[in-house]
A protein has these predicted regions:
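Active-site neighborhoods of divalent-metal-dependent phosphate/nucleic-acid chemistry enzymes
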Residues: 67-112
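A general structural signal for well-ordered alpha-helical segments in protein cores
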Residues: 23-24, 43, 56-59, 76-79, ...
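Generic structural signal for small/hydrophobic residues in well-ordered secondary structure
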Residues: 9-10, 46, 79, 104
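Acidic, PIN/NYN-like endoribonuclease modules and their adjacent C-terminal/linker elements
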Residues: 1-3, 101, 105-129
Length: 129
């Protein structure tokens, strides 16, 4: 696993691909330091939002050389447990985001996201700009 790895969430990658300064600057720094980690879920979310063919090429270029975490059956089970635990506290996260949070927790990674609901996940390290 990448030392000091950072899972860069879909919300940030979308802004990066659009060239929005805050995301572009930080993601570029993380890429140059070889700290970016992603997951199949995040890749699927990016691909789902493609509007033009050239965007697919940009995503492929971005992801080349980036470590990709796989979501195993035990991780899905843990994501379900976390989702259930959060719901009992009145917090509902999309299951995809719960799985991303568990990936970060299980791999001792930081999550770079613009989605505020991740702050509700206990012990999740959020990347600070």
């Amino acid at each position: 696993m990448i030392k000091d790895g950072v899972i860069v969430d879909t919300s940030v990658l979308i802004d990066f691909l659009k060239g929005i300064a805050k995301a572009a600057t930080e993601v570029t720094k993380l890429l140059q330091a070889n700290r970016v980690v992603t997951a199949g879920i995040i890749i699927a979310e990016l691909m789902q939002g493609i509007g033009r063919v050239d965007e697919e090429d940009r995503i492929a270029e971005l992801l080349s050389g980036v470590s990709v975490l796989e979501v195993s059956t035990p991780l899905w089970i843990e994501a379900g447990r976390l989702s259930s635990s959060l719901r009992r506290k009145g917090v509902t996260l999309p299951l995809t985001d719960t799985a991303i949070a568990v990936l970060a927790l299980e791999n001792n990674l930081t999550l770079y996201t613009f989605d505020k609901h991740f702050a509700q996940v206990p012990n999740l390290k959020i990347y600070k700009v």
